[in-house]
Amino acid sequence: MEKIYKNAVKLLTSQGKFYIDLGLDRISKVMELLGNPQDKLEYFHVAGTNGKGSVCAILASVLRQAGKKVGLYTSPHIFEYTERIQVLDCQNNLSPSRQISKEAFSRLVFEICEIADKNDIHLTEFEILTAVMFKYFEEQKVDVVVLETGLGGRFDATNIIKKNLCAIIT
């Protein structure tokens, strides 16, 4: 599994970590090809200059304590890409937070990159990660997503969401 995960990370990082092409067309098209999983979820969308990660962590914890199954999407990661995509579940008291497994992460990176490649869509690294997150949280049937923006602004890939319960600016 570790080798498959490393190959997924290699594919992900080859997609243009420092490549920026403003617009939501690419991510929107890929999400449409995936069945628009982002439209089946509800969000607390967190943006701002400083403190986004802290606000996201606190908000996700409060929602979990309130009995919600929470998807948490933050960046950057410290050790592994899987740290960015977590599920906080009130049903599991021993481990209230679970990172996406390397197996699920790899499967979704390969699936999304294959769809993008077949349709001549050139996604950035952040767009791929965001697509992985949307699909994974749909699969996990989370009640709500706490979503941290990437670069922020109108063309941030996280801005394709439609069911925004609350927008928070730090």
Where are these regions (language model features)?
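Short gly/ser-rich anion-binding loops that grip negatively charged ligand groups
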Residues: 46, 53, 95-98
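Generic secondary-structure boundary signal with a strong preference for alpha-helix termini
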Residues: 60, 162-165
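Gly-rich Lys/Arg/Thr-decorated short loops/hinges at beta-loop-alpha junctions or inter-strand turns
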Residues: 10-11, 111-114, 165-169
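Conserved beta-strand segments that form the floor/walls of ligand-binding pockets within enzyme
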Residues: 45, 86, 168
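Short functional linear segments
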Residues: 1-48, 55-61, 65-66, 73, ...
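Residue-level signal for inorganic ion chemistry
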Residues: 12, 49, 70, 146, ...
